[in-house]
Amino acid sequence: MIGVCQLHLRIPESHSLKEKRHILRKVIDRVRHRFNVSVSEVGDNDLWQRSQIGICTVGNDRRFVNSSLDKIIDFIEKMYLADVIEKEIEIITF
């Protein structure tokens, strides 16, 4: 199973692209180190108060993969650095 999640974030404390990248780096690094998943900014690169990040994880159980993505989303929301305004989750079976 491959779990893919795309999050649309609003970053209210950002007033420039430099501040946005600084905040995103914190979010991405903390998620990557805590959950051992792949994370990257995948959209809205030139908007200073919005971003899209992609998260990918793999596992052999659908419930585990889905639960992992839910925990990551909850973790990001509880950091209070960015607001999750939209989320898309897809579980791919191969």
Per-range role (PLM):
Residues I2, S40-D61, E90-F94:
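Short, charge-patterned binding micro-sites
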Residues G3-E13:
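Short glycine-/aliphatic-rich beta-strand segments at the starts of folded cytosolic domains
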Residues H8-R10, N36, D74:
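A structural boundary/capping signal
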Residues I11-S16, G59-D61:
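A generic structural motif
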Residues K20:
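C-terminal binding/interaction regions
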Residues I23-V27, S68:
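Hydrophobic alpha-helical membrane-association signature
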Residues R30-G43, N66:
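Amphipathic alpha-helical assembly/interaction segments
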Residues V58-F94:
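C-terminal structural segments of small proteins and small subunits
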